[in-house]
């Protein structure tokens, strides 16, 4: 979806991320399979800061509802940042490979990836395997210091399906199914690569396992599409409640550095022990 966000809408977040690449200390570093740092910070609460308004914009929520075929709720969002020269990668995975183990019964879930910076091959854009969501959920497990999809099935998928890179301009967006195989590479450029992921679940598909309070249903206060340009937000992220510590590697990733954000949720993102 080219130009899903205008330059005027995306620039405040882009500028803030460039000015403070640790997001005030909120950003945590998770290990990839080779032990390299990959920086990310999730949040489930939606504030009146810019990062809390983005997942609630009418056009963002309406598209999610159309694709899901029913009412969605905000499961979580996250900022994923690759600084210039960072070696960290996201290994091949499906989001539902993890969310299934959090007690979500059906794969009626999706994510919209919103480019804050230009996303290129050189700075670590996302790669996907086209139509791989039709393969269903593939088992995930430990891969070095991280976790990822079963390698034998990944190899077969890559033999039969096309791998493509998502080259995005700032403000472009892509919605993708929770079973779509995706990954991203290192940033070998001198430019940062920041992307916002907003994930939604169907309201009749809540996780049933205990310990998932962070992903409980909360009514979504949708805001008009002009909320950002009209300045109907407080700060970019200063008041946002982030999850700055993933607990004990809840998604199967080793935590190299926990965030130190003052407004931080307890670590309640973990998956069941089967992963």
For each feature predicted by the language model, list its residue ranges.
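Non-heme Fe(II)-dependent double-stranded beta-helix
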Residues: 1-103, 141, 211, 221, ...
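A short beta-loop-beta micro-motif enriched in histidine and acidic residues
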Residues: 98-109, 161-162, 168, 191-192
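Short, conserved beta-strand element in jelly-roll/cupin
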Residues: 93, 102-121, 167, 199-202
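Non-heme Fe(II)/2-oxoglutarate
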Residues: 23, 27-28, 33, 180-275
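Short edge-strand/loop segments of extracellular domains
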Residues: 83, 129-136, 199-205
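Active-site glycine-rich loop that binds ribose-phosphate moieties when present
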Residues: 92-100, 114, 153, 159
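Double-stranded beta-helix
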Residues: 119-185
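Generic beta-strand structural signal
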Residues: 70-77, 88-90, 108-114, 124, ...
């Amino acid at each position: 979806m080219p130009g899903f966000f205008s330059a005027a809408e995306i620039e405040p977040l882009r500028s803030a991320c460039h000015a403070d690449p640790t997001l005030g200390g909120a950003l945590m570093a998770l290990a990839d399979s080779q032990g390299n740092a990959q920086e990310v910070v999730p949040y489930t609460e939606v504030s009146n800061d810019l990062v809390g308004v983005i997942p609630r914009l009418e056009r963002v929520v309406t598209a999610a509802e159309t694709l899901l075929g029913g009412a969605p709720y905000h499961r979580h969002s996250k900022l994923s940042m690759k600084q210039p020269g960072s070696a960290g990668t996201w290994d091949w995975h499906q989001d539902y490979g993890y969310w299934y183990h959090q007690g979500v019964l059906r794969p009626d879930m999706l994510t919209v990836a919103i480019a804050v910076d230009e996303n290129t091959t050189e700075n670590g854009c996302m790669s996907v395997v086209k139509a791989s969501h039709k393969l269903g959920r593939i088992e995930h497990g430990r891969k070095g210091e991280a976790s990822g999809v079963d390698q034998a099935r990944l190899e077969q998928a890559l033999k039969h399906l096309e791998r493509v890179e998502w080259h995005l301009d700032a403000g472009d967006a892509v919605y993708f199914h929770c079973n779509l195989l995706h990954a991203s590479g290192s940033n070998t450029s001198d430019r940062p690569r920041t992307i916002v992921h907003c994930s939604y679940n169907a309201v009749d598909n809540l996780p049933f396992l205990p310990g998932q309070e962070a992903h409980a249903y909360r009514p979504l206060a949708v805001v008009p599409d002009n909320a950002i340009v009209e300045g109907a937000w407080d700060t970019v992220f200063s008041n946002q409640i982030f999850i700055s510590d993933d607990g004990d590697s809840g998604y199967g990733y080793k935590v190299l550095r926990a965030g130190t954000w003052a407004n931080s949720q307890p670590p309640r993102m973990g998956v069941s022990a089967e992963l």
